C-alpha cells in the first residue's frame, strides 16, 4: 500500500462564490440605504465587477460582499480588493476585483519551505499549481495541515485529494 498523501491547493469554490454573490445582491436589493441606487455585483470568469452610485456606496457593497463570502467560508486572500475605483457609465463608479486561482511558483516554494523547516517526516513535491505532501504516518500529515493553516501565508490554502 502506498503512503498517505494529500494536495495543498489555492482555489475558490465557484458554487460558493456564486451563492455569496447572490446573497449579497439580495441584501443590497432589500437594504434601505441602497434603495434607488444602481449598485450591482457581476461575476465574470476571472473577476468580480462591483458597481455603485458613488465610492461610499461602493465601499458598502464591498462590506456586504465580504461578509457573505466570510459566512460561506471563502478565503478573502484570493481576492484583490485593492484595485482602483474607476468611473463607469451613467455617473456610477466601478471596481474590478481580480480572483486569484492556483498557486504561483513562489507560493508553492513557500509551502514546501514551511513543510521542510518543520522537520516532520514528510515529503513535499511541487506538482504545477499544487504541492503534494506524502508521509508514512497520518499524524504527520495532520500536523502539516495544522502548520499550514496557522502559517501567515499571503494566500489561502485548501487541502484536497486525501489518499
Swiss-Prot record:
Gene3D superfamilies: 3.30.70.860, YajQ-like, domain 2. Coiled coil: none annotated. One of its GO terms (molecular function) is nucleotide binding. Pfam families: DUF520. Keywords: Nucleotide-binding. The keyword S-adenosyl-L-methionine does not apply. GO terms for cellular component: cytosol. InterPro entries: DUF520 (IPR007551), UPF0234-like_C (IPR035571), UPF0234_N (IPR035570), YajQ-like_sf (IPR036183). Belongs to the YajQ family. Nucleotide-binding protein. This is Nucleotide-binding protein LA_3406.
